[in-house]
Amino acid sequence: AADVLVFQEDDERFNIGAGRTRDGKYLVLEAASHITSESWFLAADQPTGQFTLVAAREDDHEYSLDHRNGLFYIRTNDKGRNFRLVTAPVATPGREHWTERIPHRAGVALEDVDLFANFFIAAEREDGLPRLRLWQFAGEGPEASQTQEISFPEPAYNAYSGTNRIFDAKTFRYGYTSLVTPSSVFEFDPATGASKLLKQVEVPGNFDRTLYASERLHSTASDGTQVPVSLVYRKDAFVHGRNPLYVYAYGSYGYALPIGFNSNRLSLLDRGVVLAYAHIRGGGDLGEPWHDAGKMLAKRNTFTDFIACVEHLTTSGYGDPARVAIEGGSAGGLLMGAVTNMRPDLFRAVLSHVPFVDVMNTMLDASLPLTVPEYEEWGNPNEEKYFTYMLSYSPYDNLKAASYPAILVKTSLYDSQVMYWEPAKYVAKLRTLKQDARPLLLVTNMQAGHGGASGRYDYLKEIAFDYAFTLRELGII
């Protein structure tokens, strides 16, 4: 038999996906762009039926849904950027029938809802940190009350929903990690409020977490905004104002920078390097308003936030200002290029992975697969106001005759998201302009894509190369 067309999306800004509610009763189709979504549902026992629309798409409105006892539980940003939770009857799911269950809150982002038969977990983000809050149902209806919050003792961490496939489960699994705690899986029992450790990743080499300290602090941006920074260092190697400093950031697409344990980083920490993670605007670390404040015509906030974080770390004694290395990849590579143009004196070494550095030519070429969908993040340069603004920070277009830090640029031949010629032409132009003798390296992986080497050990070789470059430039080896 011929394939049957179930759904077709003609707007190239949108991607489509299919799933099922946790109770298994409904199939769900979703079409979503960066800022807008639309969902349809169909009873799972009627696969040849017609899908029903929940709420028609409207620019800047995103929503997602799950099902329990004849009601859809819908996470929506219709009343505010940080989302709220509503319910709607399956028979009449339109917005006019939505009933609020958790209101929108200015300082708390509702990132996800894990729905079960007897309770649900609201995954939220407050002051840049994840929160997991338990709501228990009073009965078969939607009435529920928040009864507990899972507590996390460390100042900088990541906590997230685990694999929970059973709708009538009595417990809830979640993941936890921090800058000094390896990735762990816990089981939370709503009846007792206790969490039980089920599994923790083993770290070879006699790892002792008590040797390391993690902190969370805030930097003041140029407009007065407080920008969170998470950091980790080895206690017995820390000397105020003397340590090499390594700062990582991303700051785009509303992506909240995950703070987690990485055994590879021990190679740096044990050599006295202080590692810092800057939660700059453009990311989602403080909810969608944080994203809004670092995209489109506010994108330069991303760069000035990062500069403020580095300056605050060095003036506060967390690093030697003459030995600062920075790292970012993809859109984080755009960040690396922009801040290096703005403040080349601030950094000793720059690691830029698959960097989006030729903003103008890429965003003016609508034939590239990601260009049109990306208008919602960067702006459409075919409009003068966006063209002028994007040109003001595009790394390739703002290279100048000046002294630059040591720079390592890495790209991949089969990268379909940031084409290899972007980093290549960036390096070629910079090589003709730079007024110093510091290294400028372009490394092209001839087999990889956007994520770099994927072999079991190949990616470790790439990390070793990065660290060798960093340690050499910071004067450690």
Question: What residue ranges belong to the model's regions?
Answer:
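Short loop/turn segments immediately following the C-termini of beta-strands
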Residues: 32, 77, 125, 177
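Structural motif
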Residues: 1, 35-41, 80-87, 128-135, ...
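Active-site-proximal cap/loop segments of hydrolase catalytic domains
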Residues: 277-477
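Structured, non-catalytic alpha/beta "coupling" segments that mediate domain-domain communication
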Residues: 72-73, 82-84, 170-198, 357
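Multi-bladed beta-propeller domains
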Residues: 1-15, 44-62, 89-110, 114, ...
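Cap/lid segment of the alpha/beta-hydrolase catalytic domain
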Residues: 153, 175, 188-194, 198-330, ...
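Conserved beta-propeller blade repeats
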Residues: 11-30, 56-75, 104-119, 155-175, ...
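Beta-propeller blade termini and top-face loops
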Residues: 4, 24, 30, 34-42, ...
